[in-house]
Regions:
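Positively charged n-region of N-terminal signal peptides that target proteins for export
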Residues: 1-6
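Electrostatic cytochrome c docking/interface patches
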Residues: 28-55
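Bacterial N-terminal signal peptides
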Residues: 10-19
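Inter-heme linker and motif-flanking segments adjacent to c-type heme-binding CXXCH motifs
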Residues: 69-70, 133-137
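Axial heme c-ligation environment in periplasmic c-type cytochrome domains
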Residues: 26, 76-83, 103-134
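Sec/Tat signal peptide C-region and signal peptidase I cleavage site
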Residues: 20-26
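Gly/Gly-Pro-rich "capping" loops immediately C-terminal to redox-active cysteine motifs
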Residues: 42-49, 69-97
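Sequence/structural segment immediately N-terminal to covalent heme-attachment motifs in c-type
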Residues: 45-69, 98-100, 104
Length: 137
């Protein structure tokens, strides 16, 4: 029995490290070197934020919720869409990284499809501006 317990400890430690890594990744979906270099070409303005909110309500609310808190009624079973109003979720994510996640999706683990075929680049940048406007300060 002592051997099993001794062999179990490294496996448990490895599992813990994997869990911490996955959790850290979930808190920062970006991490794209390309995204870190991108600059938002759309100035944040009341017009951009309003357009971004409209695009968000049309495309994103079903999973992320009308209030962007991750409580949408149509999220795939077993998934937990991000609370996009939580500044902790956004920590470390640049506008470019958020843009790329919206454009290309986050998956397969996070099960978010990309919207490049449904939204123009300008619409996506407006959504980024909207999300910045609703994040906790």
């Amino acid at each position: 029995m002592g051997r099993v317990s001794t062999a179990f400890v490294p496996a448990l430690a490895l599992s813990f490290v994997a869990l911490v890594s996955v959790t850290a990744r979930a808190q920062n979906p970006g991490g794209s070197p390309e995204g870190k270099k991108m600059k938002n070409p759309v100035a944040s303005s009341p017009e951009s934020i309003k357009a971004g909110q409209a695009a968000f309500q049309k495309n994103c609310r079903f999973c992320h919720g009308a209030d962007a808190k991750g409580n949408g009624p149509m999220a795939p079973e077993g998934t937990h869409p991000s609370n996009l109003t939580d500044d902790k979720w956004d920590r470390g994510s640049t506008d470019g990284e958020i843009f790329l996640v919206i454009q290309n999706g986050a998956g397969p683990k996070f099960d978010m499809k990309g919207y490049k075929s449904k939204m123009t680049d300008n619409e996506i940048w407006n959504v980024v501006n909207y999300l910045r406007s609703v994040q906790a300060k």
